[in-house]
Amino acid sequence: MSKAIVLVAFGSANLDGIKKSIGLLEKDLDSYFGEEYTTFKAFTSNKIIDLLKERYDYVVPHLSKVLFNLVNQGYEEVIIQPLHIMSGRDKNQIEEIVNEYKYSMKKLVISKALFTDEDDKLNKESYEVGNIISENIGNNDILLVGHGSKTSSNKLYDVIEKAVREITHKKVYMATLEGKKTIDTVIESLLRDEVNNLIVKPLFIIPGKHVVSDISTGDGSWIEMLKEKNINVTINENSLLQYEGIRKLYIRNINEVIKK
C-alpha cells in the first residue's frame, strides 16, 4: 500500500528559508519514515505559489493538487502535517481541503500543529519548545518574536514567554509583528528593567521576509531600534524548524497519528 506524509504550510516566498526549514524536516522524515512513507510538501497560498514559480522557477504545489495527484497515483494512506505554530484559521482551511478527499483513501488524517489550544497540553508543549529554543542564551536576557494576530488571542505567546522565563531564569519579553505586543511597548519595558544585553529569538516555522526586513536589517528594523537605546543585541535567525529538537517533536506527532 502506497503511503505519504504531506507537510503543509501557508507558504513563504523566501526560497532559501524554505530549504533551511521545511527542507530539513523533509530530510529527517525521509530518514525516519522513508522505507514506508514518501514525503511531499504543499502550500495553501496561491499567491506565494505563483511568486516562487515566477521568481525562482521553483514549484511547491497547492495542497488540493497534491491530494488530487496522490489519489490518482493510488496512495491509500496519507498523513497531513500542518506547519502552523497553532491550530486556527489555517488549519480550518486544511480541513476543508482534506474533507474533499477523505472518502478517496483508506486513511487520510491530519496530525496536530506544534501547539494546541487546550490549556493543559499547551503548557506542556510550551515547556518542550521552551527548553529547545533556550539553548545558547549566554549572559543575555531574551526577546521572543512571534507573528501575532490582529484578531485572535495571543494566549500562546503569553504561555511560551512564561515557560522560557521559568526555564532560563532570565528576563524574557515577547513582541509580535501584529497585535498588541509591539516592539515599542517592549522597548519601554527593557529600558525600565535596565536590560543591557539581549538575544532575539524568532518563533517562526519558516524564516520569511519578516526576520530579514522587519527585525534584523535596514532602516527602522527592530535591531536598529534596540541599538539606538544602547542595548547590546544578538539575533538568532534560526526558524523553529532549524532546531533538531523541534523537528523531533513533529516526528513524534506523526508517529502518534500513524499508530492510531
What label would you give each PLM region?
Residues M1-K260:
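Extended amphipathic ligand-handling, pore-lining, and cofactor/metal-binding catalytic surfaces
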